[in-house]
Amino acid sequence: KKTATVYKGKTTTLKATVTGTAAAKVTFTSSNPKVAAVNKTTGKVTAKAKGTAVITAKCGDVKVTCKVTVKNPTLTLNKTSASVKVGKTTKITAKAAPSGKVTYKSGNKKIATVSSNGTIKGIKKGTAKITVTCNGVTKTVKVTVK
């Protein structure tokens, strides 16, 4: 690969193939280990922080590079606040990059509950905060039950 995109906290493995040499030893280095660290023998890249780094694979005098871009995970919700009547439901839709397990939690289950798929049910009048989390990113939705 000439380029790769990896999300912070995730890994990818770069492979280098050498032809014509029986016992060729390839070593990997990173131009910026604080952004993308690489195991010098396996080529496994760990994304550490947002930014770019160039991973170099070297065998003897031959070098090849791969530009690695590290992105922060994102979580986008279809709404930041919601209104629902007692006994009725509304839904929060979450989009995460990279995709992962999204969790929903009500800060006050006596006012509003939330299911594992983001469906909010109004229990009694008041306000509650719904916390949505994925890949270490947290967002909140203020729910008003009428």
Description of each model-found segment:
Residues 1-146:
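Extracytoplasmic soluble-region selector
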